[in-house]
Amino acid sequence: MRIPIITRRQFLEASGVAAAWTMAPTTLRSAFALPQVNHKFDDIRSNLLHLINEEREVEKARPLELDDFATSVATAHAEEMAKNEFVSHWGRNGMKPYQRYSFAGGYHATQENISAADNTWSMKPEALKQDTSYLHVRLYQETPPNDGHRRAILAPHHTHVGVGIAVEQLRLRVVELFISKYVEFKPVPRIARPKDVIPLNGSLLKSNYLLNTIEVFYEPLPKTPELEWLREPRSYALPDESQVLRPIIPPPYEYADKRPGVIQVKSTGEFEAPVTLFKDSPGIYTVVCWLRRNRGEKAFPATELCIRVEDVNP
């Protein structure tokens, strides 16, 4: 009997490649310990960064920088997926990408791409480099309307990316965590009570951008999902329930709905806003600053700052 010879690419396709697109401390310190980044994968990370920036250059989007903190967060999720044999934007604790990043100590806006291959032939560095490149290119080559990964790679407002890589036995997991760094916050409480008013103080890092609105999203506390649930592909998004805060505008100008603005914005780019945790029940609030460069441009999310409310007396 003749044994068919197949390429590594054919083997990856046959073994099942999975990919899917689109989380306390009292200050901005990490809510959990992040793993040490395995530097044996540095060459693979550099190669993926090179691929990403080549693809962005074609679309005239700015090149991204590799972010160490985002890489640590991405690595933690990649390792968890590899060890527990699942592929999901949700973690074992039920947290989504922006929640993981925020409760680790971050607050910038994120987008996550994940990819995976099982039963890979070789764990040698050059073989893994080929596999991770192939997995990434599959995401980049998506076509509308199912092109969420590609849009994450090419989004013009991203500034940085973290790359997490994990190998467990013959399981390979890759996490690309895209970051948008435009805002700096002063320390913010990460644990609060229902109906608390959190003073939010920040500044824009780029003078050619405007603060359009601040949107405060609410969702219930995450529940621990079953592993079988994590093994089913699904996309993630911010929750539907939210309240919008707008900048104060001088009289005689007013908003069409007559509601007053509450965000004080200075000419220096500094801003202040009272963020009300508007529900009586426990949950997670995510504070999103929407920015734009001019009045006619579509606003984009620049922050995803999460605050956890557990009960009346945390």
Outline where the language-model segments fall.
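Short beta-strand elements
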Residues: 295-314
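Short, compositionally biased P/S/T/A/G/V-rich stretches that sit at domain boundaries
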Residues: 168, 177-205, 209
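Short, well-ordered surface patches within globular domains
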Residues: 34-103, 147-151, 155-162, 170
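Eukaryotic low-complexity, intrinsically disordered acidic/proline-rich regions prevalent
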Residues: 206-212, 259, 281-283, 295-300
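Extended low-complexity, serine/threonine- and proline-enriched intrinsically disordered segments
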Residues: 208-246
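A well-ordered secondary-structure block
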Residues: 97-180, 213-220, 246-290
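N-terminal secretory signal peptides and thylakoid transit peptides that target proteins
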Residues: 1-19
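C-terminal segment of classical bacterial N-terminal signal peptides
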Residues: 23-29
